[in-house]
Design a protein with these regions (language model features):
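Universal eukaryotic N-terminal targeting presequences
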Residues: 1-5
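Primary mode marks residue(s) on the alpha4-beta5-alpha5 output face of response regulator receiver
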Residues: 6-60, 69-237
Length: 237
């Protein structure tokens, strides 16, 4: 069976001459890293460590219907693309989450990933949820071990939420988040920013099937460590 066709939609090409990741390092040095958080909120605080990665996430938020007739989060899955070089082209960097979300919404329902060939930026890893270390509930994971960091057993981070704030764009987009490391060596702090899409409908019929909702975001990760796969990356806004 032939693979399902992607929509006719063109991502802006990565800037020429800026390189692609090679084994053991990422594409671009970030220069001065800065994370710009929404004004008027106190739930998220600026990173205490150097920004090490900035990633474009393209995937799904997952939800289950409760007996109360409302949706509860059941985690998320996403591909993580290296957008380290886009800091050199602010017009693209500042809108890449919108460009990706437009393409992702146009993709047929049977297409579960846009893929690096469609996006045009290197795939670094995956975002998913795993059983929490306590054995109860689930925790978010950012994992490079199956893609850009094969053979690196600690090339992941399992995290816990520190805080969340409503996206500056409103309730149509999932919240911005700050998280902290629980396991792994990929990062000490993680931020979900520049979100597009992802929230569940307000109500559901108890007993109905789980749903998935498309979303995109930037993920900004910081670390004290000299990363095993990096030079440090760019600011997040």
């Amino acid at each position: 069976m032939a693979a399902p066709a992607l929509p006719s939609f063109s991502f802006p090409k990565p800037p020429s001459g800026l390189g692609k990741p090679l084994a053991g390092r990422l594409a671009c040095d970030p220069g001065a890293a800065k994370l710009v958080l929404p004004t008027g909120q106190t739930a998220l605080t600026a990173p205490t460590d150097v920004i090490s990665y900035v990633l474009l996430g393209v995937g799904f938020q997952n939800y289950t219907c409760t007996d109360a007739g409302t949706y509860a989060s059941a985690g998320a899955v996403a591909d993580l693309f290296d957008i380290s070089c886009l800091n050199k082209v602010p017009a693209i960097f500042n809108s890449i989450q919108d460009i990706a979300y437009t393409a992702w919404k146009l993709a047929p329902a049977n297409v579960k990933t846009l893929g690096a060939s469609a996006v045009g930026y290197p795939l670094l890893g995956q975002h998913f949820f795993a059983t929490s270390p306590s054995g109860t509930g689930i925790s978010p994971v950012w994992d490079f071990r199956a893609t850009s960091a094969k053979g690196k057993a600690d090339a992941f981070v399992l995290a816990a939420k520190v805080g969340n704030t409503t996206a500056p764009t409103g309730a149509k987009d999932v919240d911005w988040l700050q998280l902290k490391n629980v396991q792994g060596s990929l990062a000490t702090q993680i931020y979900r920013t520049d979100t597009r899409g992802g929230p569940a409908p307000a109500t559901c019929t108890p007993g109905s099937a789980p749903i998935t909702v498309k979303y995109t975001s930037k993920y900004c990760e910081s670390s004290l460590f000299a990363c095993f796969i990096c030079v440090r990356l760019i600011h997040c806004a």
